[in-house]
Amino acid sequence: MAFEFRLPDIGEGIHEGEIVKWFVKAGDTIEEDDVLAEVQNDKSVVEIPSPVSGTVEEVMVEEGTVAVVGDVIVKIDAPDAEDMQFKGHDDDSSSKEEPAKEEAPAEQAPVATQTEEVDENRTVKAMPSVRKYAREKGVNIKAVSGSGKNGRITKEDVDAYLNGGAPTASNESAASATSEEVAETPAAPAAVTLEGDFPETTEKIPAMRRAIAKAMVNSKHTAPHVTLMDEIDVQALWDHRKKFKEIAAEQGTKLTFLPYVVKALVSALKKYPALNTSFNEEAGEIVHKHYWNIGIAADTDRGLLVPVVKHADRKSIFQISDEINELAVKARDGKLTADEMKGATCTISNIGSAGGQWFTPVINHPEVAILGIGRIAQKPIVKDGEIVAAPVLALSLSFDHRQIDGATGQNAMNHIKRLLNNPELLLMEG
């Protein structure tokens, strides 16, 4: 009897997801922890590894199909694993996890006693067999660093943790090699014959596009949007970035204008805390957030993603620049985790990178404000009674009028303008 592998709950918030890509097909021989498929849900793409070694008998769910946690997605000929049970399987006889059997403690591994703080909310990537192995060894798996692909924890990592050593990197290279061997050139789509004077084709709405559509409609239906549009002379900002661009490059940092905007926005959120709240009309509550996490809208081939710079108030411009660049690469490669896209208190949308100027950005609900930045263009301005050319930045600030009054919104915009006009103030007030 084949082992039926069901779509698991792997701790990434996935309750259903679209099978974006299969890395295996019927007849393939696989090893435990090989990547079976990529599953996409609500803007994140997660790799699903195999819990067993064996031969793929049948792929049950086609690419582009949405599966629910617990659905059988692939059958694997793995006789030794038929009785294994995994989180997400709904068999009544195995609804509870068996506690580790009490046996004679012959050469029982010492319980890990490291005293470092452990983030109990941390998302852990590990196979069920590895989780069981960690329990048997008395190790809190959330304290273990993973050396496998995408940070996945292996048995060797648990052993290294027990020995007080660093995790081995051999598994990462092995996983990469396996991924390269399994990856195949996707077949070219069948040619479509267009007939008639007004030919049309249809396609299923991708999971990410559905998620984006749902979020946009919910935001516009829930929050009465008001958008303020303004502009500011950024000659000093231009010169400041130019001055430190080479210094940043020497330490491997690509310095752009966006980190300056992040710091200016954080300062505005602190000065006008109404912009750093959520408005819960159903509960009759306003949620005040005493942390400053900035979402950065990123355009990708899959659609709009919003990775988050956590605790932006605690980071330097160089640090923010590095983090934005790293998140942007992950976004383009489809490697962002759910954790990297949640927790924002306010968002920045940069239409300037596409050549845009002013626009009406949609609030990333349940946030109550979003700052849009346009292109920097040379424009004539009046300075000391004379008309001169200067680089001018376009700004658009949308806010939820249930929570933020027009004057508050404009005052916040003025504060951002003031800091971007004189970036040295970021050291004093940012």
From Swiss-Prot:
Tell me which residues bear N6-lipoyllysine: K43
This entry carries the following GO cellular component terms, namely: cytoplasm
Q: Which Pfam families match?
A: 2-oxoacid_dh (PF00198), Biotin_lipoyl (PF00364), E3_binding (PF02817)
Q: Per UniProt, which keywords does this protein have? A: Acyltransferase, Lipoyl, Transferase
Q: Where is the Peripheral subunit-binding (PSBD) domain?
A: 125-162
- EC number(s) per entry: 2.3.1.12
**Catalytic site:** H401
Residue ranges, annotated region (Disordered)? 80-122, 165-200
Top enzyme class, one word, equals transferase
Query: Bound how, and how many: what does the cofactor note say?
Result: Binds 1 lipoyl cofactor covalently.
| Family annotation (CDD domains) | lipoyl_domain
Give GO terms: molecular function aspect only: dihydrolipoyllysine-residue acetyltransferase activity; lipoic acid binding
Q: Which cofactors are required for activity?
A: (R)-lipoate
Which PROSITE patterns does UniProt cross-reference here?
BIOTINYL_LIPOYL, LIPOYL, PSBD
Location of the Lipoyl-binding domain = 2-77
The Basic and acidic residues compositionally biased stretches are 84-104
The catalytic activity, as recorded, is: N(6)-[(R)-dihydrolipoyl]-L-lysyl-[protein] + acetyl-CoA = N(6)-[(R)-S(8)-acetyldihydrolipoyl]-L-lysyl-[protein] + CoA
Q: Where is the composition biased (Low complexity)?
A: 166-193
User: Quaternary form?
Assistant: Forms a 24-polypeptide structural core with octahedral symmetry.
What family classification does the UniProt entry report for this protein? Answer: Belongs to the 2-oxoacid dehydrogenase family.
Q: What does this protein do?
A: The pyruvate dehydrogenase complex catalyzes the overall conversion of pyruvate to acetyl-CoA and CO(2). It contains multiple copies of three enzymatic components: pyruvate dehydrogenase (E1), dihydrolipoamide acetyltransferase (E2) and lipoamide dehydrogenase (E3).
Record's protein name: Dihydrolipoyllysine-residue acetyltransferase component of pyruvate dehydrogenase complex
Species of provenance: Staphylococcus aureus (strain COL)
